[in-house]
């Protein structure tokens, strides 16, 4: 341990706060919180740790700390510091798992929509639903029962929905605010768990229609009742109080934490969320960090109640999230927490079983690949591929596999700078030169094996740069494809000799993964550049659009297709003046210009 670390550890306060671990570059690699800073920070440098924590500690060369007045303040500060520094060893929940909601818009003539994008607008949101099918089935039923506007833009004449009795035709008739409010209130009542009352009202209307000999109307009402029954049958009631609540459980093993969340809506368990991540703190601290990030995710509404395991400080959760938090001692809520804990434990056990089995196979594949090539075990493999469809936007990509697994933080993209036109060999020479010149200059780790996606010419070009120009002697192999552009075999040596691998072997499978991954990475980069150039060229002739506005539009919309579908308002929201937005809209609407 560095002497200055010992000195800083000796003067740590016994107060709550946050600590920031730094590596040799001064980069914050981990942020944590503690009830007692002195005890928590010192624990990293004493006692035994699992492999993941050892890797973290091995990179720490300095730390800072911030004293707070309470545990709650430390928790809030920790989340802000994680967002600011994005440390590589911290949990960072991805905001990519979104659930569908049913939305009643706040328009003068409101509509029912399904959305995964919950905004802070005046609309009313109901959900989340476990999947799109469930949301669509419910909306379809509501569309049949309640005649709100269906069209996104007001047509000039009544549509089919009006003739089907599913719309009041505000496009041509006056529909008052009171009429809309009455319909919206009925929908809200249904979505808030009042389906039994709605069903009873429909049943009464059905019998009345039958007595009046209005058999078509009675049949429509009967079908609506059947649809309600079908949808509600799929959702098993587990709580009788109809309170919306999220029930949390967790398990910890081998330096990993699994958190399971059960979403209970209107008394029904509709879905669960499973998250697994490495943990470097005490389990309770890791859980609090998780739950803070969980509700920062825009797809996770805070329910009326949050139910947490007995080991968690529910009062702290309640003050932090500003929502009721409970630790059940008995009853159905306690049963649900125990079920969530049990599921978390099972999920971790399955993960470790699969990891152990996969790691054994992967390590064996790397060892066998080295033996077949006659080299030392290639723990670090770097692979290169070029991409230049139709000679435009030539690029190359490098990926790294460490012990048979992709190390995505090590991936690199290259725009070809010195080569004119599509010349694969010269492109390969340029990229190999750039990669390993920098590796030597910055003392970066060198690979045990370099794989070039190509034949003898590509291999010769890369070898020439590596050996004759840079003086590096690293085993290098060419990855040859068959006529279907699939992995065939390797070539290695001078002159290159083929190395045939059994197609059902783990080492062949490893090569396939490397080839697919480097090809995917290269072609994705090429498409990004090509897409940008297509958009920019398409906007070249529009008055008032310079390079700055092109970049703004590209960043906001991402593709020409989305721009063609956008309205004038959406162009204004992207930062365009209204007159420019109208010009862009008119230009893109004219298909002859594109």
From Swiss-Prot:
It is found in: Cytoplasm. The keyword Transmembrane does not apply. Keywords: Cytoplasm, DNA damage, DNA excision, DNA repair, Excision nuclease, SOS response. It comes from the Bacteria. One of its GO terms (molecular function) is excinuclease ABC activity. The keyword DNA damage applies. Residues 196-231 form the UVR domain. GO terms for cellular component: cytoplasm; excinuclease repair complex. GO terms for biological process: nucleotide-excision repair; SOS response. Residues 14-91 form the GIY-YIG domain. PANTHER family: UVRABC SYSTEM PROTEIN C, UVRC/OXIDOREDUCTASE. The UvrABC repair system catalyzes the recognition and processing of DNA lesions. UvrC both incises the 5' and 3' sides of the lesion. The N-terminal half is responsible for the 3' incision and the C-terminal half is responsible for the 5' incision. Interacts with UvrB in an incision complex. Belongs to the UvrC family. This is UvrABC system protein C. It comes from Bacillus cereus (strain ATCC 10987 / NRS 248). The gene is uvrC.
């Amino acid at each position: 341990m560095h002497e200055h670390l010992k000195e800083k550890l000796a003067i740590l306060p016994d107060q709550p706060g946050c600590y920031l671990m730094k590596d040799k570059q001064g980069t914050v690699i981990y942020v944590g919180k503690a009830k007692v800073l002195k005890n928590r920070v010192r624990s990293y440098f004493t006692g035994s740790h699992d492999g993941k924590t050892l890797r973290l500690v091995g990179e720490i060369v300095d730390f800072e700390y911030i004293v707070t007045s309470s545990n709650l303040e430390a928790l809030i500060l920790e989340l802000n510091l994680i967002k600011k520094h994005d440390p590589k060893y911290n949990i960072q929940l991805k905001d990519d798992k979104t659930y569908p909601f049913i939305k009643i818009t706040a328009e003068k003539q409101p509509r029912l929509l399904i959305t995964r994008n919950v905004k802070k607008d005046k609309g009313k949101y109901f959900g989340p639903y476990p999947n799109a099918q469930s949301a669509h089935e419910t909306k379809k039923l509501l569309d049949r029962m309640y005649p709100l506007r269906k069209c996104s833009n007001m047509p000039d004449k009544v549509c089919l929905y009006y003739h089907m009795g599913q719309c009041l035709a505000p496009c041509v008739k006056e529909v008052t605010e009171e009429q809309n409010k009455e319909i919206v209130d009925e929908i809200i009542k249904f979505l808030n768990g009042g389906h039994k009352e709605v069903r009873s009202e429909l049943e009464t209307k059905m019998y009345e229609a039958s007595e009046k000999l209005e058999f078509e109307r009675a049949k429509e009402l009967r079908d609506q009742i059947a649809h309600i029954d079908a949808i509600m049958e799929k959702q098993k009631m587990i709580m009788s109080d109809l309170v919306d609540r999220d029930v949390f459980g967790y398990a910890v093993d081998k330096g990993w934490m699994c958190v399971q969340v059960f979403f209970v809506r209107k008394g029904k368990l509709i879905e669960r969320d499973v998250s697994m991540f490495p943990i470097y703190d005490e389990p309770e601290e890791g859980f609090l960090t998780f739950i803070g990030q969980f509700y920062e995710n825009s797809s996770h509404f805070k329910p009326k109640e949050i139910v947490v395991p007995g080991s968690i400080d529910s009062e702290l959760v309640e003050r932090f999230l500003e929502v009721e938090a409970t630790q059940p001692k008995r009853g159905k809520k306690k049963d649900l927490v125990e079920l969530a804990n049990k599921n978390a434990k099972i999920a971790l056990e399955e993960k470790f079983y699969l990891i152990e089995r996969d790691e054994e196979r992967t390590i064996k594949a790397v060892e066998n690949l080295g033996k077949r090539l006659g080299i030392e075990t290639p723990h670090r493999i770097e692979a290169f591929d070029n991409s230049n469809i139709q000679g435009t936007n030539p690029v190359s990509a490098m990926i790294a596999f460490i012990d048979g697994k992709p190390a995505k933080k090590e991936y690199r993209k290259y725009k070809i700078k010195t080569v004119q036109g599509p010349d694969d060999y010269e492109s390969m020479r340029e990229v190999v030169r750039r990669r390993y010149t920098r590796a030597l200059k910055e003392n970066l780790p060198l690979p045990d094996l370099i794989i070039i996606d190509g034949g003898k010419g590509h291999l010769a070009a890369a070898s020439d740069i590596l050996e004759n120009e840079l003086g590096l002697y690293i085993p290098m192999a060419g990855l040859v494809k068959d006529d279907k552009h699939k992995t065939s075999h390797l070539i290695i040596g001078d002159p290159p000799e083929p190395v045939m691998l059994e197609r059902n072997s783990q080492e062949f499978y490893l090569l396939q993964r490397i080839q697919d991954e480097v090809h995917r990475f290269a072609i994705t980069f090429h498409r990004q550049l090509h897409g940008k150039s297509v958009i920019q060229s398409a906007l070249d002739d529009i008055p008032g659009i310079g390079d700055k506005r092109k970049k703004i539009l590209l960043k906001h919309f991402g593709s020409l297709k989305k721009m063609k579908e956008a309205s004038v308002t959406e162009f204004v929201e992207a930062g365009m003046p209204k007159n420019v937005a109208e010009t862009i809209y008119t230009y893109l609407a004219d298909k002859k210009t594109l």
